[in-house]
Amino acid sequence: MEKAQDYRQDNPGLGCAKLYLIIKELFEETGCMPGRDAFIEILRKHGLMVHIRRRKHYKTTDSNHNYRKYPNLIVDLIPTRPNEVWVADITYVETTEGVCYLSLITDAYSHKIVGWAVGPTLETTYPLEALNMALASIDDETARRLIHHSDRGCQYCSAAYVEVLKQHGISISMTQSGDPLENAIAERANGILKTEWLYKMTIATRAECKAVLERIINFYNTRRPHMSIGMQTPEVAHGQSGEQRRCWKNNYAMG
């Protein structure tokens, strides 16, 4: 139980099935690992089950603008390498001082968060900061083989953001509707951060928010296994190539 408690402390919203697989891998050779149902019952008795807290919703996408909107280039595309498709999105983070907005860029192949930034407004400054962080991790040739996919929000369609993408020779792809399935991997990354961490904590100040997010994103990238990449961490998957093995049939169902 000590290992399970440690993981719960670092990742309070991690699902019981994933937690079981992590602990099983650590202790299976000892011969004292219970079955999944028995393990979940032990979690219940020790008060280690997941409890979801819903929060207020904040609008983060404004598609009512006159900027050019680009076509969706990734319909039915299954990435087979890292840095083939990056997906971008903005979500909110509540603090006692007020809301902050988190800009994320996630690799569609490995699900690794490769760029992020947080700020008090929805200005394009913060998505650009996340983009520049991601770009710092690749060379020019890799950038020219990359697709950047996002919703049609004004930040991603803005002249400043599009200019950076074009300067690096990156192909621009955007959703064609408000259907979250058109940007499912980005939505899933947002959802994991919120339901497994942010909904379960109180962040006192906006200044504290960045340090908290840095710790969470590091755990997400290096320690949280994903069913969409064969129960590997994003960091491990980011060093691979070839189609990833999923642990279920529907790519949008889980993460």
Report residues per predicted region:
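A short acidic/small-residue loop/turn micro-motif
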Residues: D107-A108, V118-T125
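Conserved, non-catalytic sequence blocks in retroelement Pol enzymes and Pol-derived host proteins
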Residues: N11-G13, C32, I78-T80, T95-T96, ...
